[in-house]
Amino acid sequence: MSSILIALGLTLFAGMATGIGSAIAFFAKKQNYRFLSVATGFSAGVMLYVAFVEILAKGATALARAYGEIPGAWINAAAFFGGILLIGVIDNLIPSAENPHEVPSETQMADFRDACTLSDTGAADCDDAGRKAKLLRMGLFTALAIGIHNFPEGLATFLAALSDPALGVAIALAIALHNIPEGISVSVPIFYATGNKTKAFAWSLVSGMAEPVGALLGYLGLLFFFGNPAGGMPPQIMGILFAGVAGIMVYISVDELLPTSRAYGRGHDSILGMVAGMAVMAASLLMMK
């Protein structure tokens, strides 16, 4: 039971990072978002390294044990691309305006500020009611879209932590970092539509709570089909899940994190953050052996 609580706790930590993004949007200097470039690049490096070096390898080992080396390798590859296909379908079902992979740039956030002026108390004031409603709709639909995306991410963190708590910590940290700009994409339009920082912060936090909900539903599913997940699952199921999770993480890194990092950074901020993330993850995995 303790391993299950740790796994659920890590997904809760990762999900709450959307609230950190919301706070940054309100209190950080609006003209300097380079820290987001490095942070999201770092997160991409961690997730790519873990996906290819650790999680995909775990899937291959489990499937080879269940089906033999050659059939297991084919099933591992199929499950990997199945994970990419799954998150890709989810991604493309969501309109780009509300898609969390389309994080608002500095220019877009400047447009929000131009659309709604700030009073001396820091509250937003929109003269155009239609524009205000559009901003609110954008923020709320973005929160919903992030919630949908966070379900498989929560399951990925949960499964990794259940198998290896140290690996789960690394993945939770990477997902938490990539949830920060998603929190910004929810809170900024809601704040400039309502003038209420508390409401904007609350919605960004709620969107991240889909992460532990996804983990909890995954746990209940495993409990229903396999009894006690902490006691171990059949290797063929664990292998397919790990390979699929690796595919999901690679898609998120390439489609979301790296483009976001490039959009916010200058020069080589993005690649430096990514390499640093890979190096830290490599050192962590080596020290844990």
UniProtKB/Swiss-Prot annotation:
The chain crosses the membrane at residues 4-24, 35-55, 70-90, 139-161, 206-226, 232-252, 268-288. One of its GO terms (cellular component) is plasma membrane. It holds the Pfam family Zip. Keywords: Cell inner membrane, Cell membrane, Ion transport, Iron, Membrane, Metal-binding, Transmembrane, Transmembrane helix, Transport, Zinc, Zinc transport. InterPro entries: ZIP, Zn_transptr_ZupT. It catalyses: Zn(2+)(in) = Zn(2+)(out). Fe(2+) binds at N150, E153, N179, E182, E211. One of its GO terms (molecular function) is zinc ion transmembrane transporter activity. Belongs to the ZIP transporter (TC 2.A.5) family. ZupT subfamily. Mediates zinc uptake. May also transport other divalent cations. NCBIfam families: PRK04201.1. This is Zinc transporter ZupT. The gene is zupT.
